[in-house]
Structures are given as C-alpha cells and as structure tokens.
Amino acid sequence: LITGGSGHVGANLSRELIKNGIKVRCIDFDRDYRAYENLDVELMPGSVTDKESLNSIFNGVDIVFHTAAVISLERRNKDLIRSVNVEGTRNVCEASLKHKVNKLIHFSSVDAFNRYPLEDPLLEDRPLIEDRKAVPYDLSKADAQRIVLEYCEKGLDASIIHPSGVYGPHDYKPSLFGQTFVDIANGKRQFNVNVGYDYVDVRDLAKTAVKCVTEGEVGQNYIVSGNYMDFSYMSEVMSEELGKQLLKLTMPMFTLYLGLPFYYIQSRVMKRPQVLTMDSIHTIKYQNKIIPGTLAKEKLGHSPRSIEESIQDTLKFFIDQGVIN
C-alpha cells in the first residue's frame, strides 16, 4: 500500500514496486490519476485523515509506504499540514498495527532535524526539531516521526526515511521544485541567486525505500541524500540541453525578500502554491550542506546517480508532458 500514490514519490515508488513484481495498492484523496496511467495498480480513493476509511483500505496489506503529506512552506496552511502530516501519520500507524502489517516505511524529511550546528555533517542521531515556532512543515515531520517511534514501542515494525530535496521524472502535479524547474526552463525566471540544496533523484529514493523493507531495522531512521546542486550549475546543464540561455543574471540573497509580494500575488492569481515564502528562504539560507547519507549507502545500498543524468531525464519528462516549450 502506498499512501499519497499520485504524488511525486508515490508515482516513482509504484513503478519501482511493479518492476520488482510486487502488487501495488494506492490510496489518494486526489482524483488526478495521471501518475497511474498504464500502471497495473489497485486504486482506492480515501484519505489518511479519515481514520474509519482506513480499515477497508488496509485489509490484506503486507507493506505500507507512507508518503502522503502536505508539502507547503506557507504558514496559512499550518492547520492542514498538521492534520495530514501528524494526525494522518498517527492514523496510518494505528491501522498498520491493527491490521498486523509486516513493515511500515515512513517518509520523513531532512527538515525534521534541528538544523544547528549548520557546519556539522547531518547524521541520523541529530535531535529532531522541538521549537513550536519552527517552520510548520518541518515541525510536522519531526512530530510525525515521534509518533512512528511511539508505535514501534507498541510492536509496529517501522523504519523511517529522511530524503533531502527530491527531484526527477514522473512529477505530474508538479511538486514545488518541479514547478520551479519548469518555470526556469520556460524562461519565466530571469535571475538566479547563488544558492543550492542537496537533491536526491526520486528514482534512487524509491529503490532505497524498497530495499528498506527487508534491510531496514525497527525504529531506525535513514538519511537518503543525493548531491549538493546549486542553481547556477543546474541552469547551465539545462541551458546546454535546451540550447538557450537560462537564468542570465545572478542577484544577491536579499533580493529574494524583495520578490515575496510578487510571488504571493502570482500564487493567488494562478491558483497554485506559493514557491517563494519567508519559510522557503529560511530553508535555503539556513541549511545543512554536508549530508553524507552514509548509513543508507552502507545498509540499504543507496547509490545516487549524477546530477546531469537527473536533470536530463527530468527535462525529457516535462517536455514529453508538454509543459516545457
């Protein structure tokens, strides 16, 4: 069972499981089923926030991949974030325990950890965020992990995966990063800020998550990172592939704050999530740049592919979808 099956991670996870000969059931409240086209999966509409509906959905399930989450850096969504990411996780854990699921793989995030000290490598033993005033999404992932660990003590066999930033193909909706990627490719963003982030290819993440079913230890968390990629280099690779110059100007960091009103208006007019917010700037500005992911590499065989391959395949996917000119 995959919760949030039509999302970016869920879409790639479905394909990886099918490739491994595993029967897949997906639950999703969203009726956007493009992620399932031509896939042999069992679709069950529902929501992790509807505790009662999970009884029939979990019937006969052996393994659960809990990917369903609200990924938003807009504080106006904090109640929804809490409902889905925290209480939804509690419902999934309760249903998993009740239906005697063999294994739960819970998808958390590197953002669940306390960021400080920034200069130290981010490892699995880093304390989780406790500050109630923290970014709502970050705090929700930390609290959800605490719930998973609580259920492990009750007998649930669960392992936790902390991806860094996620990118790659089969991003149908698309994700926040996917929309940014498309906007850059279409020339809708003319300037660059010299920052970056650690990104893992979603296909590598899916492979590692499947391996975690058999190799992941109960209650253990695994950081699944990729490569640090700054947006200047990303735009260079994209420019070369598309044959046109992208992100022509590099601006100082403070200009991001100047752009906040524009992105707010844009999100309201176009009725899509706001990509640039105070919290997203905070995430970029105060990040852990050293994320070795050694435990996942050693125990789960995680092997990140190159930045160039990921960008090329992501471009091809969006071009095939008709969203890049």
Residue ranges, per PLM feature:
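N-terminal Rossmann NAD(P)H-binding glycine-rich loop of SDR-like oxidoreductase domains
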Residues: L1-N20
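NAD(P)H-binding glycine-rich loop region in Rossmannoid oxidoreductase-like domains
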Residues: V41-E87, A95
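Conserved Rossmann-fold NAD(P)-dependent oxidoreductase catalytic core, especially the SDR/UDP-sugar
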Residues: E87-Y137
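Active-site Tyr-X1-5-Lys
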Residues: K133-S159
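A hydrophobic C-terminal alpha-helical subdomain
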Residues: R189-V193, Y199-D204, M253-K299
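Mid/C-terminal beta-alpha module of Rossmann-like enzyme folds, strongest
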Residues: T208-V275, G293, S306-N325
